[in-house]
Regions:
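FIC/Doc superfamily catalytic core
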Residues: 2-176
């Protein structure tokens, strides 16, 4: 369609400027997709089983919340959501505690995987920091404002470097 915007770096419209959400710019957290489409509830359950095995805890379900969370998950799998909406949903799942143990680790792991795929174009160190910020927010150890600031600033800085607007030190230029 002629009126559709091309999708570019980290899901932001492909146009000059950074994806960090400045005036007239789209935040990378506004990228929309069916982020949970290929992540079944069975996968989430297996991630929790792995976290419990690693942590030496018994895997099991919270009878009061597991069914509701699983049905909400199935519903969200079919929806196109922004990354921010998806992250908020993962945080709600963590707080809903559908498993006996390691809910934070489980849903943070899903968020980390999504961020790793979506921000694959970022330099490795920045991508890891974005993944960490998103995971820590989902797990409840980082506030929303800080997470948004970290994600947007790392994407903005990376975009400036990728476009050559930042003079790299000689050692960094040599390694490129």
């Amino acid at each position: 369609m002629g009126d559709e915007t091309e999708i570019g770096f980290a899901g932001a419209p492909d146009r000059p400027g950074h994806p960090g959400g400045g005036p007239g710019e789209q935040s990378p957290l506004q990228a929309r997709a069916q982020f949970l489409k290929n992540r079944s509830w069975e996968l989430v359950t297996s991630l929790n089983q792995g976290a419990c095995a690693t942590g030496g805890a018994q895997h099991g379900f919270n009878r009061e919340t597991q069914e509701t969370c699983a049905s909400e998950w199935a519903e969200k799998q079919t929806q196109s959501l922004s990354l921010e909406e998806t992250i908020e949903f993962l945080r709600r799942c963590h707080r809903g505690a559908p498993f006996l143990f390691f809910n934070g680790n489980t849903f943070a792991d899903v968020g980390r995987q999504l961020a790793g795929a979506l921000f694959a174009d970022l330099p490795t160190g920045r991508r890891r920091e974005v993944m960490s910020a998103i995971a820590h927010y989902i797990a409840g150890v980082l506030d929303r404002e800080s997470m948004v600031e970290i994600v947007e600033s790392l994407c903005e800085a990376a975009e400036f470097i990728l476009r050559g607007e930042v003079e790299l030190p000689p050692a960094a230029r040599a390694s490129k």
